[in-house]
Amino acid sequence: MDAPVSFSLGAMGPLLRKLDSLPVAPEIRLPEPLKDGIELLKEDLEEIGAALVEQSMVDSPSHRARYWMDEVRDLSYHIEDCIDTMFSMRCGGDDGKPRSVRRHKVGRVKVDGFSKTQKPCTRLARIAELRALVREASERHERYQLGDGRASSSSSSSHRVFTAHGQVPAPCRNLVGMDEPKTKLTNMLTDEAELHMKVVCILGSAGIGKTTLAEQVYRKLRWQFDCHAFVRASRKPDMRRLLGAILSQVQLRIRISDTSTVQSLIDNLWEYLQKKRYFIVIDELYETATWDIITSAFPEDNNCSRIMTTAGIEGVALECCSYHSVNIFKMIPLGLDDSAKLFFNRVFGSEQQCPYELNEVSYRITAKCGGLPLAVIIIAGLLASLPCKTELWYNIDGCLCSSVTTDIDLDEILKEIISLGYDNLPHYLKTCLLYLSLYSEGFIIWTADLLKQWISEGFIAVIDGEDIEEVAESYFYNLVNRGMIQSVKTKYNNQVLCTVHHTVFDLIIHKSKEEKFISAIDYSQTMPGNSLEARRLSFHFSNTRYATEVAGITLSQVRSFAFLGLLKCMPSIMEFKLLRVLILEFWGDNHGCMSFNVARICRLFQLRYLKISSQIIIELPAQIRGLKYLETLEIDARVTAIPSDIIHLRSLLHLYFQDGIVLPDGIGCIRSLRTLKYFDLGSNSEENIRSLGQLTNLRDLHLTCSAPKSNQQAKRNLVILASYTGKLGNLKSVKFSPGDSGMDISFLFYGIGISVDRSRTASSLPFSVRTLELPSICIFARLPDWIGQLRKLHTLNLAVRELIENDIDSLAGLPDLIVLSMHIMKAPMERIVFNRKAFPVLKYFKFICGTLRMAFQAGAMANLHRLKLGFNAHKGEKYDNILVGIEHLLNLKKIAVRIGGAAEAKESDRMAAEAALKEAIRKHLMFLDDLDIARVECVKEEYKCIKKKHKIKIEDSISEKNGDSKKQHSVEKKAVWGKTMKNIADSGVFPEDYTMSREQRVAEGFVVGIEKCRAEDAAERIIRNVPVDYDGLGQVSTSKIQDHLPELAPRAVQNEKFGSSNDLSIMIQINKYARLPSYEWRDTDISKLNFRLLRAPMLLEAVTARCHLLDLILIGSNNITVLDLGRPTITKLPASIECLPNLRYLRLQGTQLKSLSEVIVKMPTIRGLDIKNTKTEELPQGILRMKKLSHLSMGEKQKNIQVFMEKMQTLAETVQDSDDLSDETEGIADDEGEFSTRANASTPKVDEDEVDRRANNFIARFRKQITIRNSGFAKKESSIDERLWIRDLDECQLSKRGGRF
């Protein structure tokens, strides 16, 4: 096992490995003298390296020994820097051949020290100088006589402790001695007789469990308040961050602006909390000044609001409670029994599993912990890592004796035990723990980020065959189990947030400074002396009042730099030369800085880790291929552009950009990639999606679809993705989430999702997948069969339109499924039953559906801890058996329920559902720790809530158009909403691929003309968003709206009582429908139906092929206005068509009709006739008598079009469609004779007198408008004069001219 970078050995281990590999590196050809010099240097370093290891294992080294170790560590860093400077000037090109950095012109900036290759003689002389320094250090070691030090048995241990797959052992989560304090504190906070805002403070020494108690009470009570927040302060709190955290929790989905000041945050909090019942927890208050600032943000009202604080100083506690000592809850240490119980749980699992010979010493050690839970946890973590040998345990007991005196000081006991726990850590764990001093006190850290930083720093030592990330994870959980790191929150997907207890933080800050490992500087500190030559440096300059630029620090040697604060305090990147880790989190100020240029990072050739978080736009360099060691690139900010050569970063492991970013084509070239977040299916090319199949090392794939060009494109991209993911044999996690802007797949509403047919996207996901999250953005028609084949699945989150019992059975057998989240769009007809032994290891279950019908049999979900439910209350529904068998969930700890309201449901219905649910839980789950039931507006179903969302969007758009949202616009909002829903419902009657013309919508009466906008233009606007075909002027003539309304239209058909689906049972129940599709109907079906109110049947092949069925429907349907017979099975018109006195629109497109019956000309109400793509070549002469015919659509077969242009008295406008000429003119005419036209701008002008003469003749002959669509006639030369003749009318500007025919 190679030695990693460590605080005790410096860079000695990596340096020796580097010197060992240099002479044989294929990309560097070294002359023999230089190879010999490198070999001699390595031998010298190995000698002093061995002495350094010996000294690092001494318990209490002398001052002289410390001085020598510091010198050798610095020397190892210095030599590695020199080696990197001399030999890291080359980077691989596209073809893998070595090229100089100058060839790439990185950033077009000259790089000092790297501009040209050093001569071999120069490098040989430099190696000789380094050898001289090493020999001097070796001589001082002999002169100081440092070879007699004795190694510590504890600190010399290199034993590594691993935990199973990143899980904190179950005993770590067991709480001891909390029941009684929790009950008392809860009673203090829930006294409803005290209406005024009340403050309760938990007082106790460090490590006694104040935070744990506050968290338990907070989780229990928070749902009883309108809003709530839990934040942690510190001894040097960042007030802006603290107040921003409160505001973001009480006012969800708010984004704190960079320009927000402390006072503006206080004002926003004060305003938002007015007249609200709030519950705020402020943990770890140290100063009254901090409390004075925070409390000014909370209005003192009579809404029973509560604030809970924790403090270790009695004066601070009294100040918080306005010196009402009765509101101070004083915590007392654990008794010996509780301390022993906690100890045994942590070490052995229970006291019964403790070896007999260790029982007595265990009680002795526990008694010396002073009843402090943190002390017990740390000492238990120490002993759990040691062999169960009596002598070792008694040695630990002996070390604790000095901590216990007759006058017990709990703070000193805790410090002593923390110090003992630290001293007994292996060196590799000490290094990782000390690295946390890079962050400020109380900072919440994402574990995933921390592990990647450890790896980039070189702290992780791996043995052949081990995965470096798994080893890093084992380091982390080892420190958690030892109590050195605290897990703040573990999300359902196993993402962990962590921090460090302030007492532990004090220790690692002290040790880090002592070892010159990390220098952390904040605005309140003077510049420490050891920061001048720091290798790892962090700045915390978030206070706008005191933050200033730092001077006097040399940055060229800094290897790791973390910056948190105002952008103006950020040092120039040009000053860094050897950075390996760069962490930037900055914000602007009131001066309006909008962007930050980090193009100079292309100089940092040793960079391994780069993370930038900001609301400011980041300008990346145009090229970064010179960063050949870069492993993590994470930009949590908007960027101007992605470097085009990012695909050439051969060492890149983790790539993160915000959603919506278009990655350069060829992303599959980064074969080393393990994490890709986010890959946008909407903006990336299909070729780039295919290239994902080349990322054979990919483990975590985060997908989004922020802005697809169309719903069809999104579906097509999903199919492409599914066909290539099977090649990713190492894939463990697939997550699909909507982008920040949502996924706009419809012109009508926002972010519904992609409707996915499971047969079309049959998954080729590898069996290695452990996490699959496909939430409501991707909706399956049914649960895909292939999900049951993913036997290693750990987390599953998906949405399906419909769920049946067999689907649950296929999931119940997954052996490793721990997290299951399901969103069911269509309410099941039968109760969902979870059978005995179903989901044996499931711990988290979330189920969202319009109705709550489920039952748990005995033995189902035996290990379930958290249950989240969401459903809608319905009008008049009874909830006697709302959760059948919930008493069988014996390990359930937390329940969260959201109760919405279905259509027509009242508040009383939601209250009834809530009362029934609480009663069921109270009766059967007395042991429950956390119950959260809340009434919400609506739980998303297939139709109801989407409808409301669309309605809100319409109202907002009208308000925006008018500049406000005053009441005078309510009529307009209502009118627009009504028209929209009619068109949506009309779409829902038809199948997905059915196309509708704008004339059909006008004939239905859904779209009417208004001033300056005729009905046809209004219809064109409605169907504009989903075009299928265009007319000559580029206007949409037909559309497929159903394809873009997978959620709304089908349910709108039923809920608006507008049409009916193919579900015969529903149709018979409603018995009132205006529009009707028919599929596989039989004679017996039709006999059950009443067609009296039918207005628009859509008759498919099953009916049109049988004339007697068609006659059965049409006879007696006097209200039919639209009739679609456009099916190839129609060879003649049914005789019953003459029984339709109100028919306005007749569609015969695609039929086999050879001629039109004279019956049609006897129907004076017809306004639209579509005979395109039929075999009809001649039109009946009687068609000239159809006075109301305004739309006639014909094809090439109608050869007698010229006759109608000359003879048809009602012709007001002729339009010829042509793919070549694309000419069309549409007119407006009414019964008053008003007429105007719009013409193509390219129309050639003619003589004005001729135009006037033609116009007068035109108006004299015709009084109404007709639009004739012909797909082939416009290509004939004979039609050119007629087209120009019509176009010329536009120049006449005809209005109020002419009269009745």
UniProtKB/Swiss-Prot annotation:
Keywords associated with the record: ATP-binding, Coiled coil, Leucine-rich repeat, Nucleotide-binding, Plant defense, Repeat
Region annotation Disordered: where it falls in the sequence: 1214-1249
Entries under SUPFAM superfamilies matching the protein: L domain-like, P-loop containing nucleoside triphosphate hydrolases
UniProt region (Structured coiled coil (CC) domain), positions on chain: 1-177
LRR repeat locations: 604-627, 629-649, 650-671, 673-697, 728-751, 790-813, 861-885, 1020-1043, 1060-1083, 1117-1140, 1141-1163, 1164-1186
Pfam families per UniProt: LRR_14, NB-ARC, Rx_N, WH_DRP
Record-annotated NB-ARC domain positions: 181-464
Tissue localization of expression: Expressed in leaves.
Keyword Coiled coil: yes
Claim: Repeat is one of the keywords in the record: yes
GO molecular function: ADP binding; ATP binding
Biased composition (Acidic residues): 1216-1234
Entries under PANTHER family matching the protein: DISEASE RESISTANCE PROTEIN RP (PTHR23155), OS11G0226933 PROTEIN (PTHR23155:SF1046)
Family in the record: Belongs to the disease resistance NB-LRR family.
General function of this protein: Probable disease resistance protein. Resistance proteins guard the plant against pathogens that contain an appropriate avirulence protein via an indirect interaction with this avirulence protein. That triggers a defense system including the hypersensitive response, which restricts the pathogen growth. At the opposite of cultivars Aichi asahi and Sasanishiki, the cultivars Nipponbare, Mokoto and Hitomebore don't recognize the effector avirulence protein AVR-Pia from M.oryzae.
Name of this protein: Disease resistance protein RGA5
Species this chain originates from: Oryza sativa subsp. japonica (Rice)
